[in-house]
Amino acid sequence: MKTLFIDRDGTINKDCPYCHNPSDLFIYPDAVDLLQRYQDDGFRIIIVTNQSGIGRGYFTESQFKEFSDFMNDKLKENGIVISAIYYCPHKPEDSCNCRKPETGLFSEVLEDYKVDIPSSIVVGDRNEIDGEFARRIKLPFRLLRH
């Protein structure tokens, strides 16, 4: 299935320092429009996000999941279904293979889903991270800034 791989903080929601509190959630209206258009065009929506706040001890995986569930509920109110969220909990200096722009999260998705790679796309707010991730997995990239 064609898939939209989309970043979270700064792309779907306003980036706050280590977002993890549901009361801090602000979803960009243009991101909702974009997600709706891709979903209407038959794309599966998967979030791929770096969450170094977990590795730094600023918040727990449980808090991350609570924030994610809250965001997903808000998106569902707009008819948007997020199929999955893949995240890297590591700090940049941990040199893992899952922190974007590394491709480990993409490999995880491919283990779990059948992806029509030629028809898929990456959307994010940072060319040096999300764009480089897209280039490494050989997918087109769309920059979304608010």
From Swiss-Prot:
Domain of life: Archaea
Residues that, per the record, bind substrate: 7-9, 15-18, 49-52, 99-100
BP-aspect Gene Ontology terms: carbohydrate metabolic process
Pfam families per UniProt: PNK3P
Annotated positions for site Stabilizes the phosphoryl group: 49, 100
Reactions it catalyzes: D-glycero-D-manno-heptose 1,7-bisphosphate + H2O = D-glycero-D-manno-heptose 1-phosphate + phosphate
UniProt-annotated location(s): Cytoplasm
Site positions (Contributes to substrate recognition): 99
Enzyme Commission number(s) from the entry: 3.1.3.-
Binding site for Zn(2+): 88, 90, 96, 98
Primary location group: cytoplasm
Residues binding Mg(2+), per UniProt: 7, 9, 125
One Gene Ontology molecular-function label: zinc ion binding
Gene Ontology CC: cytoplasm
Transmembrane parts of this sequence: none
Cofactor: Mg(2+); Zn(2+)
Keywords noted in UniProt: Carbohydrate metabolism, Cytoplasm, Hydrolase, Magnesium, Metal-binding, Zinc
Active site positions: 7 (nucleophile), 9 (proton donor)
Subunit structure: Monomer.
Protein family: Belongs to the GmhB family.
Name of the protein: Probable D-glycero-D-manno-heptose-1,7-bisphosphate 7-phosphatase
Organism: Thermoplasma volcanium (strain ATCC 51530 / DSM 4299 / JCM 9571 / NBRC 15438 / GSS1)
